[in-house]
Curated annotation (Swiss-Prot):
Designated gene of the protein: cysN
NCBIfam families per the UniProt record, alphabetical: CysN (TIGR02034), PRK05124.1 (NF003478), small_GTP (TIGR00231)
Quaternary context: Heterodimer composed of CysD, the smaller subunit, and CysN.
Associated pathway: Sulfur metabolism; hydrogen sulfide biosynthesis; sulfite from sulfate: step 1/3
Name assigned to this protein: Sulfate adenylyltransferase subunit 1
Organism name: Buchnera aphidicola subsp. Acyrthosiphon pisum (strain 5A)
């Protein structure tokens, strides 16, 4: 490799590193064209290689629905059952980039029975593309996916009114769907950013290239919008949140605390507070795998060395010295239930919250949400794919934020005690004891430890519901 090639390669790497990343998902009713849209994006941005095109043409003849044409939906419908049925079942992730930005796409399922898959895809995305069939207008699944997207903290919605070619590109149909969605959106979060784009994913109109068949539409193409939109981070850049994930002690002369800086900034010499111990200390060093830093920014993986010798554990938080954040032991959360086993009040689970594993107890199911009508329904249980609001009790005081304020420190996953399978995803609505005044109860602590022992070594006794309802009712 000559010097010019090395220089060009270095410039290319520098350019790639400077590109911002946008994570978005596509969702909507079955057969609205989600997979076709992603296939069109990849095809028209030259992201499909010649050998992939060759196999795609072959697969299109066997599984495709477009006659002799390439079925672009097969680019992302990877499972055999998906290709045979013509639907998306699993969340399919695809990566591509343009000269302006890098993208991660999540193609989520449209069927109601795959709500948990859709929630999984939405949990890490910044933007949601809601596909609407121009012939059918808004559907119950459109309402459901809009709500789930906003429930998972997504503030940017693109309503992609697809298959405009099948309604003769009529502006009236586009405007009516737009009007209906704006009326519905009043039931969602107040701070949403919504844009409407008429398109045809099959023909590639208003996806990457502007069409001349809809002169009444003066907006940009889908790709142009994705390349230029600026996502406002809901996480405050001032509120320091550094959960300790690992105690780094390679030898007797070094003790550091490793983790990811989730929000705020940190610099050498900064005075911080450690929660839940509520102890102050000063940052003496910030170390990475290959160098030392004077300061650290959001998203950096670092090891922090403190001036004082303090007993710090995994899951403890470093926050600003003037932070009002306090440990809490009770909270109200929204939950997406992801297993066939029914969720009932009085049951207990492990949860992972900001890297810390802790026991929680379901004190009360406040209501179940009908995601098609957004009505609150009184319920004593949650079944697979249900979304509800519950009151939980942590076995120990923990640190967290409301999910609406910080997605990183306000989310948790529920883990079954016996199988260690993930059974639910929770988003914290608020704390019920902001001041951290946790009542001490040694009897409950003993019974909780005794319960741990029994469920670990004698699972066949089948006692979780009986014991924990008595202890934490």
């Amino acid at each position: 490799m000559n010097i010019n090639m090395k220089d060009n390669f270095k410039k290319w790497l520098d350019l790639q590193q400077k590109k911002t990343l946008l994570k978005f998902l596509t969702c909507g009713s079955v057969d609205d064209g989600k997979s076709t849209l992603i296939g069109r994006l990849l095809h028209d941005t030259k992201q499909i290689y010649d050998d992939q095109l060759f196999f795609l043409k072959s697969d299109s003849k066997r599984h495709g629905t477009q006659g002799n044409e390439i079925d672009l939906a097969l680019v992302v419908d990877g499972l055999q059952s998906e290709r045979e049925q013509g639907i998306t079942i699993d969340v399919a992730y695809r990566y591509f980039s343009t000269n302006k930005r890098k993208f991660i796409i999540a193609d989520t399922p449209g069927h109601e029975q795959y709500t948990r898959n859709m929630a999984t895809g939405a949990s890490t995305c910044d933007l949601s593309i809601l596909l609407v069939d121009a012939r059918k207008g808004l559907s119950e699944q459109t309402y459901r996916h809009s709500f789930i997207s906003t429930l998972l903290g997504i503030k940017y919605l693109i309503v992609a009114i697809n298959k405009m070619d099948l309604v003769n590109y009529k502006q009236e149909i586009f405007e009516n769907i737009k009007k209906d969605f704006l009326i519905f959106s009043k039931k969602l979060a107040n701070d949403l950013n919504i844009i409407f784009i008429p398109m045809s994913a099959l023909l590639g109109e208003n996806i990457v290239f502007k069409t001349k068949l809809m002169p009444w539409y003066q907006g940009v193409t889908l790709l142009s919008f994705l390349e230029t939109i600026k996502i406002k981070n809901s996480i405050s850049s001032e509120e320091l949140r550094f959960p300790v994930q690992y105690i780094n002690r390679p030898n007797a002369d070094f003790r550091g605390y490793s983790g990811i800086l989730l929000s705020g900034r940190m610099h050498v010499g900064q005075t911080i507070k450690i929660l839940p111990e509520n102890i102050n200390s000063r940052v003496s060093r910030i170390v990475t795998f290959d160098k030392e830093l004077k300061k650290a920014e959001i998203g950096e993986s670092i090891t922090v060395v403190l001036k004082d010798e303090i007993d710090i554990n995994r899951g403890d938080f470093f926050v600003n010295i003037d932070s009002i954040l306090q440990p809490s032991q009770e909270a109200i959360i929204d939950i997406v239930w992801m297993t066939d086993n029914i969720l009932l009040a009085g049951e207990s689970y492990n949860v992972k919250l900001s890297g810390k594993k802790i026991r929680v107890y379901i004190k009360e199911i406040l209501f179940k949400l009908d995601v098609n009508t957004l009505k609150k329904v009184k319920s004593h249980s949650l079944v697979l794919n249900s979304i509800g609001r519950v009151k939980i009790y942590f076995s120990k005081p923990v640190i967290f934020d409301n999910y609406s304020e910080n997605r990183m420190t306000g989310n948790m996953i529920f883990i079954d005690l016996l199988t260690n399978i993930t059974v639910g995803a929770g988003m914290i609505v608020n704390s019920l004891d902001k001041k951290g005044k946790i009542p001490s109860n040694k009897q409950k602590d003993f019974e909780s430890d005794f319960y741990d022992l029994i469920t670990r070594h004698f699972p066949h006794w089948n006692i979780p519901k009986i014991l924990m309802k008595k202890v934490y009712k």
